[in-house]
């Protein structure tokens, strides 16, 4: 049975972890290294750090926090935001990250996925997709931290990303982000049925049952959340025990 991963997501702005709703209403939480160590000690399987203003400000990821995180935790972690070329992958991986996430830059230059996969291995390349549902029922891809709509269909883009060499897909529902109403099961199910790499659910966790539903109904490999962890609403150990009791294989 596949072991599912519980992954806290830490959005970083100006060297601090922050959290908002639907990419707005930003609240300060803590420093990346302190919160990262806390989650590492509490049983998280992996961490994801996004420098959420790097792409919109057209700058590189802040590497200072990457070094500090690597020195403080003992679980894998992924870093994204402002990754535009192979050298950015090299810099982030050398600072201690295990994976690099690309979003806006991959839309602008899809070949970056292939180039990075060939140089560093598909396991290091994570395609992050910010998706928002349209009135007719499809999902559009957004870039620059959710600020700019593209003409890409989110499901088609996920499939294309895997074809190019992405080793993992993070699917973030902008409609559900920070709303705590549950994950976008419909979108996740469509993507997991079409790709053969791990898919991570993001956006919408509000209670333990939402995590179970994401695994049970959409067959995702990992479940990512932010505010329910940051503000102590759900404890990772409690969540894992609940999932285990529900028949989900997790690492305790």
Swiss-Prot record:
Name of this protein: Imidazole glycerol phosphate synthase subunit HisF
- InterPro entries for this protein: Aldolase_TIM, His_biosynth, HisF, IGPS_HisA/HisF, RibuloseP-bd_barrel
> What UniProt keywords apply to this chain's record, in alphabetical order?
Amino-acid biosynthesis, Cytoplasm, Histidine biosynthesis, Lyase
Q: What S-S linkages are listed for this chain?
A: none
**Assembly state and interactors?**
Heterodimer of HisH and HisF.
- GO biological process terms on file: L-histidine biosynthetic process
Q: Which reaction does it catalyse?
A: 5-[(5-phospho-1-deoxy-D-ribulos-1-ylimino)methylamino]-1-(5-phospho-beta-D-ribosyl)imidazole-4-carboxamide + L-glutamine = D-erythro-1-(imidazol-4-yl)glycerol 3-phosphate + 5-amino-1-(5-phospho-beta-D-ribosyl)imidazole-4-carboxamide + L-glutamate + H(+)
Localization per record:
Cytoplasm
- The protein's organism comes out as Clostridioides difficile (strain 630)
Looking up CDD domains in the UniProt record yields:
HisF (cd04731)
Protein family per UniProt:
Belongs to the HisA/HisF family.
What is the E.C. number? 4.3.2.10
Keyword Lyase in the entry? The reply is yes
- According to its UniProt record, in which pathway does this protein act? Amino-acid biosynthesis; L-histidine biosynthesis; L-histidine from 5-phospho-alpha-D-ribose 1-diphosphate: step 5/9
Looking at the keywords, is Amino-acid biosynthesis present?
yes
């Amino acid at each position: 049975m596949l072991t599912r991963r519980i992954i806290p997501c830490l959005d970083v702005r100006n060297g601090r972890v922050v959290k908002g709703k639907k990419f707005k209403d930003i609240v300060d939480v803590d420093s990346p290294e302190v919160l990262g160590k806390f989650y590492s000690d509490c049983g998280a399987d992996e961490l994801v750090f996004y420098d959420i203003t790097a792409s919109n400000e057209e700058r590189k990821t802040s590497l200072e926090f990457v070094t500090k995180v690597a020195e403080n935790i003992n679980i894998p972690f992924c870093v994204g935001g402002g990754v535009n070329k192979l050298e950015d992958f090299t810099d982030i991986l050398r600072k201690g990250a295990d994976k690099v996430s690309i979003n806006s830059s991959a839309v602008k230059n899809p070949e970056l996925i292939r180039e990075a996969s060939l140089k560093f291995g598909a396991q290091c390349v994570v395609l992050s997709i910010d998706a928002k549902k349209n009135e007719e029922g499809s999902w559009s891809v957004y870039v620059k931290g959710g600020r700019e709509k593209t003409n890409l269909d989110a499901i088609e883009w996920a499939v294309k990303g895997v074809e190019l060499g992405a080793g993992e897909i993070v699917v973030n529902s902008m409609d559900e982000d920070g709303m705590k109403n549950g994950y976008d099961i419909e979108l996740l199910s469509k993507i997991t049925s079409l790709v053969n790499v791990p898919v991570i659910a993001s956006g919408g966790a509000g209670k333990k049952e939402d995590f179970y539903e994401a695994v049970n109904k959409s067959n995702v490999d990992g479940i990512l959340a932010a505010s329910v962890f940051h503000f102590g609403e759900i404890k990772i150990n409690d969540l894992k025990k609940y999932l285990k009791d529900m028949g989900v294989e997790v690492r305790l």
